[in-house]
């Protein structure tokens, strides 16, 4: 443990479980005051103050930041982690699914960021870190809707970094590979043989295992840290080499 984030205020969306929970814990354990925005409190209570928020609903986002303003007027770190998954090809996806996923993953991230900007401007070391995905840069089968949404997040990260660099607000993103999260666990549970399916999934990873949520959280914390004052517009892969390595079979 350290005090790297002592005195700083962080907001983490999707902090109830998975990567978001690991991010909230990391910030808390290293000195930050953390506010977790999510639909349900989940397991965040030891690490973050829970504020109900549905990032897919503009009214809910406004209400969440009104509640946040009762506790703090300054925000130092925003970790945009909340999102939803989707499987299937463009033939499989319905119009409703496209709109739902893009509304939450892309527009939701934009909603939260827009609500946070005025508070971030009051910080001496403001940072936004978006959770993207390897799906933004690698053609993954049966991930059309999800991949499109994460590709948009990557582009949004760069655009936001350009828009706010003169204000000193740094904007970066992480691209996790296949992470060991509740969402992946749910997908595996739907297989005929979940144990065999997990073993096969791990075997496809260059490191021979899935990326852990704390590993992604550490990368997010690195990008959010005031020590990285010259790092903005960066896309940091945390994928065990899945994107960049081509290993012999």
Residue ranges and their predicted role:
Residues 91, 138-144, 166-167, 208, ...:
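Active-site loop immediately N-terminal to the catalytic Tyr-X3-Lys motif
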Residues 2, 138, 221, 232-249:
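Short C-terminal tail/terminal secondary-structure segment
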Residues 133:
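Residue(s) in the substrate-gating loop at a strand-loop-helix junction
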Residues 89-90, 94-102, 201:
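Substrate-binding pocket helix/loop in short-chain dehydrogenase/reductase
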Residues 118, 162-166, 229:
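Alpha-helical segment proximal to the catalytic Tyr-Lys
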Residues 113, 149:
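Active-site helix of classical SDR
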Residues 16-17:
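Conserved glycine-rich cofactor-binding loop
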């Amino acid at each position: 443990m350290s005090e790297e984030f002592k005195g700083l205020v962080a907001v983490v969306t999707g902090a109830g479980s998975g990567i978001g929970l690991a991010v909230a814990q990391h910030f808390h354990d290293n000195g930050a005051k953390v506010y977790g925005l999510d639909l349900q409190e989940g397991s965040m209570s030891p690490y973050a103050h829970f504020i109900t928020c549905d990032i897919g609903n503009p009214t809910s986002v406004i209400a969440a930041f009104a509640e946040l303003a009762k506790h703090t007027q300054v925000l130092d770190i925003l970790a945009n982690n909340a999102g939803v998954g989707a499987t299937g090809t463009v033939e499989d996806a319905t119009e409703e699914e496209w709109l739902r996923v893009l509304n939450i993953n892309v527009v939701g991230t934009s909603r939260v960021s827009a609500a946070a900007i005025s508070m971030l401007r009051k910080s001496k070391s403001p940072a936004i870190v978006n959770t993207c995905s390897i799906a933004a840069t690698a053609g993954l089968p049966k991930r059309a809707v999800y991949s499109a949404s994460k590709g948009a997040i990557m582009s949004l990260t760069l655009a936001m970094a350009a828009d706010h660099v003169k204000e000193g607000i740094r904007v970066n993103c992480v691209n996790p590979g296949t992470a060991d999260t509740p969402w992946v666990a749910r997908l595996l549970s739907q297989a005929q043989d979940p144990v065999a399916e997990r073993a096969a999934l791990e075997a496809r990873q260059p490191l021979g295992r899935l990326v852990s949520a704390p590993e992604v959280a550490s990368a997010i914390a690195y990008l959010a840290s005031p020590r990285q004052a010259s790092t903005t517009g960066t896309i940091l892969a945390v994928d065990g080499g899945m994107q960049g390595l081509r290993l012999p079979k």
